[in-house]
Amino acid sequence: GANTAVGAASRGARAGFIGKVRDDELGRIYRHDMNATGVRFETAYADPDGPATARSFILVTPDGERTMNTYLGACQNLSPADIDEATVRGAKITYLEGYLWDPPAAKEAFRKAVEIAHAAGNRVALTLSDSFCVDRYRTEFLDLARTGAIDILFANIHELKALYETADEDTAVAALREEGHPQRDFLAVITRSERGSLIVSRAGTHAVSAFPVETLVDLTGAGDLFAGG
């Protein structure tokens, strides 16, 4: 979510971030750098006796692919009390991060944000985050779409296949076209690496070609920045 907010801000959008860091060295750097990029980040620090600020050790292979070893730490302490109503009401799109669908309090925070956003006539987006996250919460993620809690879904093709438990791309895309609440518009954006992306709705599927790149250096955050515009 943070990378996506930074990406949107770098393109001139007004962006804010709601998330938890602790008042430790990494947390203070994170808060400073987010605000310095133009992303409004004012969520209160996490409990000083709780977990440290999240961090990730990332291994990048010569082909640009990455393996992430992540400690979620303080970010899992997000609660409904952290959801700033004015921030959510003022956002045309509230972007939810699937990684944080683990703790019960964070789920309640998500639901509060959805209620505020929809009451203000705004839209809610969800990113599936990774295939392991999808495997843990497949039913709940699908329920969010089918009950109208989310209006926009972001995923890569591996996450989409995991969502529908199929190895066949066409089968997964066909199932996705049927998703969403019947009384709300639903849109999905699926990335497919060098094959570009798919825009999927009940009206059909539109393929968008990828921009050709001679040398891939590091794919870390590529999907996040794609979602940021």
Task: Show which residues each predicted segment covers.
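Anion (oxyanion) recognition and catalysis
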Residues: 9, 35, 115-119
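Conserved N-terminal subdomain of the carbohydrate kinase-like
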Residues: 10-96
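Hydrophobic beta-strand scaffold residues
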Residues: 15, 41, 124-125, 188
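Distinct, well-ordered alpha-helical segments
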Residues: 82, 108, 134-146
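Active-site beta-loop-alpha junctions enriched in small/polar residues
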Residues: 99, 129-131, 158-160, 193
